[in-house]
Design a protein with these regions (language model features):
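Conserved acidic
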Residues: 1, 5, 30, 59, ...
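Terminal-proximal interaction/regulatory segments of ATP-powered molecular machines
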Residues: 53-135
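Charged catalytic carboxylate motif
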Residues: 12, 45, 104
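Conserved helicase/translocase motor-coupling segment
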Residues: 19-50
Length: 135
């Protein structure tokens, strides 16, 4: 089944589309697409965007940091084990490296995409900080 949120590039733009540009807009577009796919629980699309980032040469540690943040910010207390899982997968990647370690990133993406979502902790901290700044 094709990913629900995967755009189709034109053939003329395929080389540009496949290339990762870490210092420009495409870098942020890809991580944003991965996040949106995770939030939407779209496993296929999330794996697609992960693959695009890996093929494009994105730093796997950057990807892992973003997955860890997602586990805390977007899943949080709905599944507290998501943070532990993201850390374990990041550690596995660091121990094995690419290409075999890419499977750890895929495992993390699948877990996070299928986990229940809650940003209650994020909202609670944001509210507490806002109140603390007023006092």
């Amino acid at each position: 089944r094709p990913p629900r949120s995967t755009p189709k590039p034109s053939s003329a733009a395929s080389d540009v589309y496949k290339r990762q540009d870490k210092n420009k807009e495409e870098h942020y577009n890809l991580i944003s697409a991965l996040h949106k796919s995770l939030r939407g629980s779209d496993v296929d699309a999330a794996l697609y965007w992960l693959a695009r980032m890996l093929i494009g040469g994105e730093d796997p540690n950057y990807i892992s940091r973003r997955l860890l943040r997602f586990a805390s910010e977007d899943i949080g207390m709905a599944d507290p084990n998501a943070v532990t899982h993201a850390i374990s997968c990041w550690d596995g990647y660091k121990r094995i490296g690419s290409p075999e370690g890419d499977l750890f990133l895929a495992q993390s993406v699948i877990y996070l995409a299928t986990a229940p979502k809650s940003n209650a902790a994020y909202k609670a901290l944001s509210n507490a900080v806002s109140v603390a700044k007023q006092n």
